[in-house]
């Protein structure tokens, strides 16, 4: 992604204040989806699928901690740091761009849902991809950050499904 690419991709959003507001709302709503779906998964697994509960309680947090350490070690700059752009989404600080923790977390949560309710699981993985697009358009992630975050989230989630 170049500054020119970013300008071209975001021009329609910049020209329409409601579209920019929708981007902000989508970022917030899709992020909150993960905060809602993981605890709900744990409650429902407690009630109906105890083996899934223990896998989700172990694999997801361990994967998240390992993932966070990987991000901190790589400490890649964000697009607004490396390019001369005005990001549509505000974020304090810099670095730790690669891979996207939002894409990773939501795709991992979606994969955890598959054994309990596949439609919710797949819808959540799709929501993770959509959140990735929102964060790229927001100027706070590179496309590769999102792609790797999704791939690693799905891969770690497979450990819950197996």
Regions inferred by a protein language model and the residue ranges of each:
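Alpha-helical membrane-inserting segments
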Residues: 42, 62, 66, 70, ...
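Membrane-embedded catalytic cores of phosphoryl/pyrophosphoryl-handling enzymes
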Residues: 84-162
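Structural signal for the C-terminal ends of transmembrane alpha-helices
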Residues: 18, 43-50, 116, 162
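Transmembrane helix-loop junctions in multipass membrane proteins, especially transporters and channels
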Residues: 47-50, 75-80, 139-144, 161
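Interfacial segments of alpha-helical transmembrane regions
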Residues: 41-66
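Hydrophobic alpha-helical transmembrane segments of polytopic
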Residues: 27-30, 56, 60, 124-127
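Alpha-helical transmembrane segments of integral membrane proteins
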Residues: 37, 51-59, 120-123, 144-148
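N-terminal transmembrane-helix/juxtamembrane module of multi-pass inner/ER membrane proteins
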Residues: 1-38, 51, 67-95
């Amino acid at each position: 992604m170049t500054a020119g690419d970013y300008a071209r991709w975001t021009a329609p959003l910049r020209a329409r204040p409601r579209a920019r507001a929708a981007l902000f709302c989508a970022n917030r709503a899709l992020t909150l989806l993960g905060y809602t779906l993981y605890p709900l998964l744990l409650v429902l697994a407690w009630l109906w699928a105890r083996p899934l509960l223990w896998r989700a309680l172990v694999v997801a947090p361990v994967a998240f901690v390992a993932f966070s350490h990987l991000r901190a070690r790589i400490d890649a700059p964000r697009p607004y740091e490396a390019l001369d752009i005005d990001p549509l989404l505000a974020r304090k600080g810099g670095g730790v761009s690669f891979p996207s923790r939002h894409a990773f977390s939501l795709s991992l949560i979606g994969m955890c849902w598959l054994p309990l309710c596949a439609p919710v699981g797949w819808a959540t993985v799709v929501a993770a991809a959509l959140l990735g697009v929102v964060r790229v358009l927001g100027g706070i992630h590179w496309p590769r950050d999102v792609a790797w975050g999704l791939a690693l989230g799905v891969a770690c989630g497979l450990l819950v499904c197996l």
